[in-house]
Design a protein with these regions (language model features):
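Membrane-embedded alpha-helical bundles of multi-pass transporters/translocases
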Residues: 2-457
């Protein structure tokens, strides 16, 4: 008698070029998720002299637009009859529009305060729209390329691997260029162009390399946003999973928005953001295979529990940087980085399994509808993270300035920076565990990574 789950292997393996080429798209998703969250709020408050609360709104509102545009892009992609399939043409449209728009965000005319915030907000909104056109179909593709959960895991492995490369490159490159000439508008303009080149390489690479991917099984598009939300409510596992990841993405977004302030005002050097990112991303590359192995042996939900608890512990430890010195801060970020490796891989694996289970249970393919809602929630959470951190700055009396006139910060603002980087993300991550517990209790979700016996290679 064949082993349970062996029918998964009847699906043909994807060409290696497709798996690797698909992963290239994460050079876009990782970069666009990292650089605005890391740089944009600081650029507004410390280069363009925008008050913290106004800067937070300029970062948050354009990304909040994704709550509307992402599900619409998902439905449009589901209904698409474009030549090249329902997904890849959207990848090409995004690749042609996002890189130049991103460069323009940091090419502001000589403005200060509210006018500068308005310029950045408009360009950021346009860039967020272009990103949605690329990201929603991109995230959908693994669930449609193959029925084999192990093959989906391989595809996602390349995606998350390139995600780590993107975060490392952009997280180190963008601040290094921006700070090279003393945080001047010119240095930020050069940084925007360099990051735009990285975006273009990943986006065009993913579009070209997935030409040989299997024809996507068309999802059924829900006719309206209300219908899409109703579809999501019909899938309890998806609701719990999306809620869990939204809280965790918010925690990551808050921490990401604060890391440049933490480097400048807690560690005492704007350039300290580079070793901080090395502590964060080094474990991402090294520990991702270990998280994948743990998921195979113990189950993906068990591994997600471990990653979530470790992230919470690392965030709590970060609060003791002032008392213990920079070494404590760097050690805490290493723990967060180890956890972050799992949080980048495991929720995506759980999402792909949940989408496949929904299709098998309902007989309907709603992958793009669900991923549109997923990416909208994720993007909103990351954007809200910057907005929440900006509110912490405003509430604690942070003083904005331009590149030529730096100012000293009050003690309350320095305390707020540390708390916003540590205590607040820890609370959000702890709250996500309740939803993860509910997801684990949902009987309709099966995890083939855990249930299928190991096979010899």
């Amino acid at each position: 008698m064949p082993a349970a789950g062996s029918d998964h292997h009847a699906a043909p393996l994807l060409p290696r070029t497709v798996r690797i080429g698909y992963g290239l798209g994460s050079l876009c998703t990782g970069t666009f998720a990292t650089v605005p969250g890391l740089i944009l709020l600081y650029y507004l408050t410390n280069v363009l002299a925008v008050p913290a609360a106004v800067a937070g709104a300029a970062v948050f509102l354009p990304k909040a637009w994704d709550v509307l545009i992402n599900p619409l892009v998902g439905a449009l992609s589901d209904r698409s009859r474009l030549r090249g399939g329902p997904r890849r043409p959207f990848l090409l449209i995004g690749a042609c529009t996002l890189p130049p728009l991103f460069a323009l965000i940091f090419a502001a005319p000589p403005l200060r305060g509210a006018p500068a915030a308005a310029y950045v907000a408009v360009l950021f909104l346009l860039a967020a729209t272009a990103y949605a056109v690329f990201q929603v179909p991109y995230v959908t593709m693994p669930a449609e390329m193959t029925e084999d959960p192990h093959e989906r895991g391989r595809v996602l492995g390349w995606r998350v691997g390139f995600l780590g490369v993107a975060i490392l490159l952009s997280g180190a490159l963008a601040p290094a260029i921006a700070h090279a000439d003393g945080d001047t508008p010119e240095s930020y303009r050069l940084m925007g162009v360099a990051v735009a080149v990285l975006l273009a390489f990943g986006m065009f690479g993913a579009w070209a390399a997935t030409r040989r991917a299997p024809e996507a099984a068309r999802s059924e598009a829900e006719p309206s946003l209300r219908a899409q939300l109703a579809a999501a409510r019909s899938s309890t596992p998806f609701l719990y999973l999306a809620g869990m990841w939204t809280l965790q993405a918010l925690a990551i977004g808050v921490m990401l928005a604060g890391v440049q302030y933490f480097a400048t005002y807690t560690l005492g050097s704007a350039g300290a953001v580079t070793p901080l990112f090395a502590c964060l991303i080094g474990p991402l590359v090294l520990f991702m295979p270990l998280w994948n192995r743990l998921a195979r042996r113990k189950g993906v939900t068990y591994a997600q529990w471990c990653a979530s608890l470790l992230y919470t512990a690392g965030a709590v430890l970060l609060a003791f940087t002032g008392a213990g010195g920079p070494a404590v801060g760097y050690a805490a970020v290493v723990l967060v980085g180890i956890a972050y490796a799992g949080l980048q891989l495991l929720p995506l694996t759980m999402l792909a399994d949940t989408l496949a289970a929904d299709a098998a249970t309902t007989g309907r393919r709603r992958a793009a509808t669900f991923t549109g809602l997923w990416t909208a929630a994720e993007t909103l959470a990351f954007a809200l993270g910057a907005g929440v951190f900006a509110l912490v700055l405003a509430a604690t009396g942070f003083r904005s300035s331009d590149a030529a006139h730096q100012v000293d910060q009050p003690d309350a603002a320095l305390t707020g920076i540390t708390a916003g980087m540590s205590v607040l993300p820890a609370v959000l991550a702890a709250a996500s565990l309740l939803l993860l517990h509910r997801y684990r209790e949902t009987p309709t979700v099966s995890h083939p990574l855990q249930e299928e016996p190991a096979r010899a290679d």
